[in-house]
């Protein structure tokens, strides 16, 4: 019984993760209320994104927010 429950949970999680991935809409960072950041040039401002910048956004600085590594991204 326990093995079947574990297998069911694992299959469900992987099924949802693989099924949702390609169909997820592009993030709307304007509505995200993200933390603002300043790029390396000191004048351009962007939004902190944990991990890497999403499509349509460009990298301008690597930074940390508390203990989360990420990038400061500006819209192209």
Swiss-Prot record:
Please state where this protein is localized.
Secreted; Nematocyst
Cystine links in this protein are 37-72, 39-60, 53-73
Q: Which residues form the propeptide?
A: 20-30
- Tissues expressing this chain: Expressed in acontia, a specialised envenomation structure laden with batteries of venom-containing nematocysts found only in the superfamily Metridioidea.
Keywords tagged on the record = Cleavage on pair of basic residues, Disulfide bond, Ion channel impairing toxin, Nematocyst, Neurotoxin, Secreted, Signal, Toxin, Voltage-gated sodium channel impairing toxin
Give the main localization category: secreted
Kindly indicate where the leader peptide sits in this chain.
Answer: 1-19
**Would you say which domain of life the source belongs to?**
Eukaryota
What's this protein's function? May affect sodium channels (Nav).
Family, per entry: Belongs to the sea anemone sodium channel inhibitory toxin family. Type I subfamily.
> Would you tell me the protein name for this molecule?
Sea anemone sodium channel inhibitor type I
Tell me what organism the protein belongs to.
Calliactis polypus
